[in-house]
Amino acid sequence: MFDYKLLSALAAVVEQAGFERAAQVLGLSQSAISQRIKLLEARVGQPVLVRGTPPSPTEIGRRLLNHVQQVRLLERDLQTLVPALDEEGLPERLRIALNADSLATWWAEAVGDFCAEQHLLLDLIVEDQTVGLKRMRAGEVAGCLCASERPVAGARSVLLGAMRYRALASPAFIKRHFPDGVRAEQLPRTPALVFGPDDFLQHRYLASLGVDGGFEHHLCPSSEGFIRLTEAGLGWGLVPELQVREQLERGVLRELLPDKPIDVPLYWHHWRNGGQLLGLLTEQLVRSSAQWLVPLD
């Protein structure tokens, strides 16, 4: 039998990115957390954590974390059927990885009423849509919104739709860098805005226009900051259409190459044995996402 106090310690260390915060969340001392991790490692006969900054799970650690995630969700189902088992009456929590642009646009409206009705709290982890699945693979989250269709072992994926991005810049930026009109081959020689080192959307966009190679760019790991920097004329950027309709109407931002958007698919990944709550959340996302996402051709 598993000792779930030990597994909870492992989950807390990974989820809270360290022993100190894990101790605070569980109401224990750091030494107690460390002792539980050592005891768990003694029981399984191998390390469950790589002691780094932050600590990361080993292969067996990931398997144990996956197990903990699914047990938490199944326990919630049982408590719904037998309310007497839910002695504390605390709201359920789900850890979910998603991309910053979804969080800044449609996510809140899609899940707001659902979370209120289900008495659900969310722990949201922001990751680029191309790499968020690593959190799922590590057993750190119960669900993941990302651009990859292929699920990890033990999970399912469902296509929700696509976020449409447009290449935009301020009128002053366009006048300064493209006085004779915008041509695709000029883009690599003008400053761009990129969300982070894992963001390759600009590379894909330029490749779709037949333009290869590197390009000058700023790094801005904030969806809101990305818009502000674009408006201020620091560079051109690929921006979610959902996020800038007002700016386009007012002429604060303009499209560099009209009718040449790029669509990024969004897949919802969730554990197969995630219980009723995760199933209901999946149904809610499938049902509501069509209001904001475009169909994928």
Curated annotation (Swiss-Prot):
Keyword Transcription regulation: yes
Signal peptide: none
Gene Ontology MF terms: DNA binding; DNA-binding transcription factor activity
Domain HTH lysR-type: 2-58
InterPro entries from the UniProt entry: ArgP, ArgP_gammaproteobact, LTTR, LysR_subst-bd, Tscrpt_reg_HTH_LysR, WH-like_DNA-bd_sf, WH_DNA-bd_sf
Alphabetized UniProt keyword annotations: DNA-binding, Transcription, Transcription regulation
Gene3D superfamilies in the record: 3.40.190.290, Winged helix-like DNA-binding domain superfamily/Winged helix DNA-binding domain
Subunit and partners: Homodimer.
Function according to Swiss-Prot or TrEMBL: Controls the transcription of genes involved in arginine and lysine metabolism.
Similarity comment: Belongs to the LysR transcriptional regulatory family.
Protein name, UniProt field: HTH-type transcriptional regulator ArgP
Source organism per UniProt: Pseudomonas fluorescens (strain Pf0-1)
Gene behind the chain: argP
